[in-house]
Amino acid sequence: MPRFQRLEHGADSKSSIAVMSELNLILLGPPGAGKGTQAARLTEDFHLPYIATGDMLRGAVKEGTPLGKQAKEYMDRGDLVPDDVIIRMILDCMESPDCADGLLLDGYPRNVEQAEALEKAMKGKGRGVTATILIDVPDEEVVKRISGRRLCQKNGHVYNVFSDPPKHDDVCDQDGSRLVQREDDAEDVVRKRLSVYHEQTAPLIEYYEDRGVLKRFDGLRSPTEVHDHIRATIATLRLEDEL
């Protein structure tokens, strides 16, 4: 059986978005949902490369690739890197031998327009989205997870004043240095990030739900429980595709 089927031009998008046995996964969820933790485990489970678009951009710029040079021109001007440049980078990654069995994409798409452009580009390469993994976490829990985070100034040990507090307020248990809150972790900043996330992601969730590839997971469960649920779901998808 071939590793994946070619997508037919003109096929209905709802029926053609996930027809391949390779695993092309998109990771969605609010800040603080634990996406990084789950990504690390899933890439080991299914031997998939993890593509975080921010890291991908920085790596391309550092290596001086043609697309990296293009991206740098926009970044140096303080402009957003256009979607077509980012999508071409993603497609380049897909062409590498490491991505022969699929990939795990985090940080893109962020809105429906980007999702449509990515789908069209992948379709042109005979590929599609197998599943979009959404880790759901309520806003107030996100605020607690992020605004409660404290780092020690000396060695960067991490605490959370709500779920994993130090023995003494604002003092690291391990080296006695002062604990501080990063500016990005302040509650007002977190709430602004959540507002942007919901504005962008609500239509994106509906987009993938309409295509039958959205899989929801309860981010209030322990990281191990979330991982077990995601792994079982993806394993079932792979098994169904091979039948």
Whereabouts are the PLM-identified features?
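Glycine-rich phosphate-binding loop of ATP-dependent small-molecule kinases
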Residues: 2-243
